[in-house]
Amino acid sequence: AFYHYFDGKDALLSSLSVLFDERYEELMQQPHDEMDCIELLCWLNQELFTTIENTVSIELLARLFSSQLVTKGEKHLLDRKRTYYRLLRQIVSQGQEREELTDTRTVSEIVKAYAMFERGLMYDWCLSGGEYSLVQYAREMMPLFLDGFRKK
């Protein structure tokens, strides 16, 4: 019934990426100048995961991952032109310029690792049927993960 608003399931699923990107655009309008890049990435992650936990069904998120695994066409989650990737590149690049992040890894390597870790958190949450809070778990794990990229 929900699908009749979209041109099939693929359009519905790809709209999730658009929803996430729109959320990032809204968040970046809020003041965040006081944060270093790791705090900013953790905050964005918390806000996105709160949106996901409160408004996106696990079944729909699982279908998005499933469809991206089997699709031969466009993989929305990996589209480097998305707001998500542009924003991550900007934050990581500034983090390196401000000497908050290591320069032993390229911007692209750090962005790829971050996106992969974030997807992994969502994927595991789907696999476990949401038996734990995605937001709470990411609040503990994301800073530990990102600390590995902090300039020593």
Regions found by a protein language model. Name each.
Residues L19, R23, E47, T51-T55, ...:
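Phosphate/oxyanion-binding loops and surfaces in catalytic or ligand/nucleic-acid-binding neighborhoods
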Residues S15, L19, Q29-V56, V107-Y114:
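Hydrophobic alpha-helical connector segments
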Residues I91, L144-G148:
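C-terminal alpha-helix
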Residues E25, K72-R98, S108-K112, M116, ...:
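Amphipathic alpha-helical packing segments from all-alpha helical-bundle domains
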Residues I52-K72:
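Amphipathic alpha-helical segments used for helix-helix packing
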Residues G8-L13:
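Short amphipathic alpha-helical segment with a characteristic S/N-K-E followed by hydrophobic residues
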Residues A1-F6:
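Short hydrophobic/aromatic patch on the recognition helix
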Residues Q96-P143:
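Hydrophobic/aromatic-rich alpha-helical bundle segments in the mid-to-C-terminal region
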